[in-house]
């Protein structure tokens, strides 16, 4: 585990960018543990990327706890943030405390992330901080509210919408959130929010002026050939690499070339 103040210190704003990667499993977490990446997010996006659902809504707290435990085993020295899934904190302050407490106790994660910037959410953030649970906020396109937004659309485009997002970002910061994810908002708004709030902003489709960036590991590795949102840069093409390797294995099994002498006892 790493010190939160070394990675998400407000003093680093505008100086050193923060790199965050979303991961769900032991094997990839172990690789991330060998890299200089600053932090790992165990996101409820696993509902779509790992489980094949059309949204994050079906993901349960038990599933998030399971995956966060697995990632911690693979990356014991990384700063790990775990998403609290849909309806694990929205029903009451008490439920939010229980869910966040379970996540911290049972997974050994370093912080939790919750979506939204309402008065209720800000109150929950403040209370969680008081009892010793660091909270990362999340504004813009908040996937747990996808039905309210009418799909995965860019948020904060109008004057009223952008002003509301800025107010919520300031409120989250003042309530004690140590960092805020900004998802799918105009780059200019991402810059403005980053300048206005006193904590690091982590962007995903929020422009280059955020204090850091986050991408899903599967996405940046190019595991899904059909997934290409505008904000995504693929740093590899693992879809083709994996497909070619499996086809080679299949051909060698069919031909009898594998297993050969080197792979037999």
Curated annotation (Swiss-Prot):
One example of a Gene Ontology biological process annotation: pantothenate biosynthetic process
Keywords: Cytoplasm, Magnesium, Metal-binding, Pantothenate biosynthesis, Transferase
Cofactor note: Binds 1 Mg(2+) ion per subunit.
Coiled coil spans: none
Catalytic activity field: 3-methyl-2-oxobutanoate + (6R)-5,10-methylene-5,6,7,8-tetrahydrofolate + H2O = 2-dehydropantoate + (6S)-5,6,7,8-tetrahydrofolate
Assembly mode: Homodecamer; pentamer of dimers.
Gene3D superfamilies, alphabetized: Phosphoenolpyruvate-binding domains
Family recorded in the similarity comment: Belongs to the PanB family.
Location of the active site: 183 (proton acceptor)
Catalytic activity, EC: 2.1.2.11
Entry binding sites for 3-methyl-2-oxobutanoate: 44-45, 83, 113
GO molecular function, a single term: 3-methyl-2-oxobutanoate hydroxymethyltransferase activity
Cofactor: Mg(2+)
GO cellular component: cytoplasm
CDD domains with a match to the protein in the record: KPHMT-like
Protein's job: Catalyzes the reversible reaction in which hydroxymethyl group from 5,10-methylenetetrahydrofolate is transferred onto alpha-ketoisovalerate to form ketopantoate.
Protein name stated in the entry: 3-methyl-2-oxobutanoate hydroxymethyltransferase
Major localisation: cytoplasm
Residues that hold Mg(2+) according to the record: 44, 83, 115
UniProt subcellular location: Cytoplasm
Listed pathway(s): Cofactor biosynthesis; (R)-pantothenate biosynthesis; (R)-pantoate from 3-methyl-2-oxobutanoate: step 1/2
């Amino acid at each position: 585990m790493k010190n939160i103040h070394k990675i998400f210190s407000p003093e680093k704003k505008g100086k050193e960018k923060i790199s965050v990667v979303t991961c769900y499993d032991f094997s990839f977490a172990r690789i991330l543990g060998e890299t200089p990446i600053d932090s790992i997010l165990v996101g409820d996006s696993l509902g779509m990327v790992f489980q094949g659902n059309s949204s994050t809504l079906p993901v349960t707290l038990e599933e998030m706890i399971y995956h966060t435990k697995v990632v911690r085993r693979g990356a014991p020295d990384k700063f790990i943030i775990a998403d609290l899934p849909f309806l694990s904190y929205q029903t009451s302050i008490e439920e939010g405390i229980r869910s966040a407490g379970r996540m911290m106790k049972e997974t050994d994660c370093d912080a939790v992330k919750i979506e939204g910037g309402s008065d209720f959410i800000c109150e929950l953030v403040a209370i969680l901080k008081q009892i010793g649970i660091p909270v990362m906020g999340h504004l813009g396109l908040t996937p747990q509210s996808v039905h309210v937004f009418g799909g995965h659309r860019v948020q904060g485009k109008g004057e009223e919408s952008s002003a509301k997002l800025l107010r919520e970002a300031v409120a989250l910061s003042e309530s004690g959130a140590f960092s805020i994810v900004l998802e799918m908002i105009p780059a200019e708004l991402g810059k403005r929010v980053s300048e206005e709030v006193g904590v690091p902003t982590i962007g995903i489709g929020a422009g280059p002026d955020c204090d850091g960036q986050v991408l899903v590991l599967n996405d940046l590795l190019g595991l899904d050939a059909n997934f290409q949102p505008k904000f995504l840069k693929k740093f590899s093409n693992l879809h083709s690499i994996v497909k070619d390797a499996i086809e080679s294995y299949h051909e060698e099994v069919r031909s009898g070339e594998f297993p050969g002498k080197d792979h037999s006892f």
